[in-house]
Amino acid sequence: MNYLRTSPLHDAFNTLQPAWDESHGMLTASRVGGADAAIETLALADLSCLPKSGLKGPAAAQWLVAQGVPVPPEANSWKALPDDGVIARLGRSEFFLEDGAAGGMATRTRIALGTGTAGVYPVIRQDAGILLAGERSNELLAQTCNVNFAEIDPERRGAVMTQMIGVGVIVIRTHLPKLPCYRIWCDPTFAQYFWDTLLGIATELGGGVIGTETLLK
């Protein structure tokens, strides 16, 4: 029997009358009750279903290159993987990978590494993954973090490791079609508190929640 994974944000959607769907072995809220928030203004989405992998060690970068994975050249930066995936370099020798909706490089990397090899060690990644999008995104970030994301050049593809409302996060800026957005990852232990706080601020700014239906196609 195949058991579905549960998002660390699953309970946060119970009051939103979601339409549940399965994506990558996890129940996800493809739509929320009523109308989804206007993504152009300010919207939050749960993308925790996307497969992740991690690795670190003095030979991690060389091992990734040998697997055909594009490696960010600098610490605290990221590159795109095929099919909307992401690889972030966290410091000099640790890497975080996430597949896009149709990608598989993070999954293949995790399987290939197994329990590790000389100088390369697997890191279990079960992060809650959140998308923050819309014209008022930087206003929300300004209220929750001391990093001024509005001044960061998105073309430099920085991977920012910082704290938001007391929770350690990884943040990158990327783009939906014609719309800038941020991807945020945090420890699943703090996911409910983190989401509830962001959603409260987003609601005050005229935003809300969107389902994954239009994001994972």
Question: Where do the language-model regions lie?
Answer:
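Basic, glycine/lysine-rich polyanion-binding surfaces/domains
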Residues: 1-217
